[in-house]
């Protein structure tokens, strides 16, 4: 009933555009990175059917990496692009575009945590686990130990707060906005992404600067801007998902607003976060800070602008013409046993990489 009421309002929905006061950038290696990313996804059997392959091609995850990390070295940028394609596929197939909870949900998510904790894959590995191990091993080699742990902690929180998201969707009514914001902050997967922003620019920030209260506020504002803007931009397709479909917009609508008013309320909050980010970033960079911290703040700006530009110029992930085919992944959620065996036998823990 909740979904049907929301779907009835989609045809007249107006989606706002967002702007930020700094220019976008993009790595000149974007197309090379995209092509290698597709090859890597093929080698790790992540593209379960031709239909799924075509979806990934038109989504352009490599372009997202190139826009959000324009100054990254080629090897690091490739690892990030491969991570992004893996993450979006895993998030869709394990959490978002399948039933709210399945027999495999806990096994899939705990396997992702075990790769981070143990640096090995299970036997047999779950779908995508060996690809995830490859990404993690490459990032371990490329990052300082503490910097990798920031990334790893973000991913652990993604996997564990997915359970809170599942509980929210098992309820007859959604949680409140405050609770949703907590869940969204971590299930988005953005914290692992922003944890790489310094290394992709001027090198890893020391812990004393990274965990400074103002710096963490900037990280959180970046997360809020991207996630809440995405709640608007992905609204049409998420309402058609079989499992996870509640977001900030739908919660405001559940509280009595029309869907259009809920979009506008969310957009106002995004713009307020952008203004707050700009003010605080100016204040922090006016202080005597390290080059690495300057690079991190630049990297947060790249992520905000890069994501917004990716949605407008590159990706068809949220395109209306693909909603019916892309919103429901239940037919892909349990790849047949022969494919899973192929995955396990053809890719080993010592998967080759660019490093």
Swiss-Prot record:
Binding site for Mg(2+) 2: 96
Any one of the GO BP annotations: isoprenoid biosynthetic process
Positions of substrate binding: 184
InterPro entries reported in the protein's UniProt record: Isoprenoid_synthase_dom_sf, Terpene_cyclase-like_2
Alphabetical list of SUPFAM superfamilies matching this protein: Terpenoid synthases
Cofactor: how and how many bound: Binds 3 Mg(2+) ions per subunit.
Function: Terpene synthase that catalyzes the conversion of (2E,6E)-farnesyl diphosphate (FPP) into sesquiterpenes which are important for fungi-environment interactions. Produces a mixture consisting of 8 sesquiterpenes including corvol ethers A and B, as well as traces of epizonarene, gamma-cadinene, delta-cadinene, alpha-cadinene, alpha-cadinol, and an unidentified sesquiterpene. The major product is corvol ether A.
Name of the protein: Sesquiterpene synthase MAJ_08936
Organism: Metarhizium majus (strain ARSEF 297)
């Amino acid at each position: 009933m909740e979904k049907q009421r929301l779907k009835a309002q989609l045809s007249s929905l107006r989606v706002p555009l967002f702007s930020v006061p700094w220019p976008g950038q993009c790595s000149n290696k974007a197309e090379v990175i995209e092509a290698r990313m597709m090859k890597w996804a093929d080698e790790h059997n992540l593209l379960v059917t031709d239909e799924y392959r075509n979806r990934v091609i038109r989504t352009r995850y490599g372009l997202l990496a190139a826009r959000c990390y324009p100054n990254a070295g080629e090897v690091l940028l490739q690892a990030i692009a491969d991570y992004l394609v893996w993450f979006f596929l895993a998030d869709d197939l394990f959490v978002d575009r399948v039933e709210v909870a399945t027999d495999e949900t806990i096994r899939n998510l705990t396997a992702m945590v075990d790769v981070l904790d143990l640096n090995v894959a299970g036997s047999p590995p779950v779908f995508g686990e060996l690809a995830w191990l490859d990404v993690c091993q490459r990032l371990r080699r490329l990052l300082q130990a503490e910097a990798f742990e920031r990334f790893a902690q973000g991913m652990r929180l993604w996997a564990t707060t997915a359970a809170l998201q599942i509980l929210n969707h098992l309820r007859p009514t959604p949680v409140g906005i405050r609770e949703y914001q907590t869940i969204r902050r971590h299930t988005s997967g953005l914290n692992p992404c922003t944890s790489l922003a310094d290394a992709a620019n001027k090198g890893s920030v020391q812990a004393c600067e990274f965990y400074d209260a103002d710096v963490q506020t900037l990280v959180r504002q970046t997360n809020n801007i991207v996630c809440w803007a995405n709640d608007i931009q992905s609204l049409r397709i998420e309402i058609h998902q079989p499992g996870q479909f509640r977001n900030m917009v739908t919660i405001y609508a559940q509280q009595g607003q029309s869907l259009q008013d809920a979009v506008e309320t969310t957009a106002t909050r995004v713009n307020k976060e952008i203004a707050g980010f700009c003010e605080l970033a100016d204040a922090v960079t006016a202080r005597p800070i390290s080059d690495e911290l300057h690079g991190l703040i630049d990297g947060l700006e790249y992520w905000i602008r890069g994501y917004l530009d990716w949605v407008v110029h590159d990706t068809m992930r949220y395109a209306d013409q693909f909603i019916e085919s892309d919103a429901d992944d239940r037919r892909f959620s349990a790849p047949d046993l022969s494919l899973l065996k192929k995955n396990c036998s053809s890719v080993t823990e010592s998967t080759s990489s660019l490093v």
